């Protein structure tokens, strides 16, 4: 695809919900600072995350305070987006916010509620048979992105479950990287 990738090993919150976000924002700043050295276009640095990592990626894309903290785009795979107890992944919510979070904290980390016109363009992939993270997470995020006129694409598949990643499974979901490639070309993120 012609991309450079970095893997972030972020700290777990341990009752400090802001820690993963700070780690991800710091990583973005380091990559921007060293972009020339690494032959990277500092204006095209995006973020990608899957499942709970999708929640962190969507948090980075909706909780930035300045342009340097904002990724140029988001790629989200079967993401946990909301902290609403009826739609979230309970383990992700408990790990980030604790067992009895305040309504204010739930709202703050329900990223579909944090979308603005400044949220970066977003590509989302999810399967309808995901038994771990309900597809409503992705659908509600897409709706918020569209309401704020943020370029967004949600690609859904009937089968694939949770955690399909990029591996071949002999079912249509294995084609999602081609959908992503087309989206990235359309946005001139790759050639």
What are these regions (language model features)?
Residues 135, 139-191:
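C-terminal catalytic histidine-bearing segment of alpha/beta-hydrolase fold enzymes
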Residues 6-42, 170-175:
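Catalytic nucleophile-loop/oxyanion-hole region of alpha/beta-hydrolase
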Residues 83, 129-133:
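Acidic catalytic loop of the alpha/beta-hydrolase fold
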Residues 26-88, 106-107:
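Primarily recognizes the serine-hydrolase "nucleophile elbow" in alpha/beta-hydrolase
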Residues 2-9, 46, 153:
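A fold-wide structural signal in alpha/beta-hydrolase
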Residues 79-114, 120:
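Mobile cap/lid helix-loop segments that gate and shape the active-site cleft of serine hydrolases
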Residues 118, 123-126, 130:
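Short beta-strand/loop motif that positions the catalytic acidic residue
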């Amino acid at each position: 695809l012609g991309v450079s990738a970095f893997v972030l090993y972020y700290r777990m919150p341990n009752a400090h919900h802001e820690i993963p976000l700070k780690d991800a924002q710091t990583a973005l700043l380091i990559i921007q600072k060293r972009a020339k050295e690494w032959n990277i276009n500092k204006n095209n640095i995006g973020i990608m995350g899957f499942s709970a990592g999708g929640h962190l990626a969507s948090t980075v894309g909706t909780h930035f305070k300045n342009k340097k903290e904002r990724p140029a785009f988001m790629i989200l795979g079967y993401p946990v987006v909301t902290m609403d107890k009826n739609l979230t992944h309970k383990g992700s919510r408990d790990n980030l916010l604790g067992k009895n979070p305040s309504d204010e904290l739930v709202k703050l980390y329900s990223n579909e509620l944090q979308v603005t016109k400044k949220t970066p363009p977003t590509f989302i992939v999810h399967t309808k048979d995901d038994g771990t993270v309900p597809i409503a997470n992705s659908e509600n995020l897409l709706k918020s992105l569209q309401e704020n006129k943020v370029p967004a694409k949600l690609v859904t598949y009937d089968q694939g479950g949770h955690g399909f990643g990029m591996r071949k499974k002999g079912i249509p979901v294995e084609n999602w990287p081609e959908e992503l490639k087309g989206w990235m070309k359309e946005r001139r993120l790759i050639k």
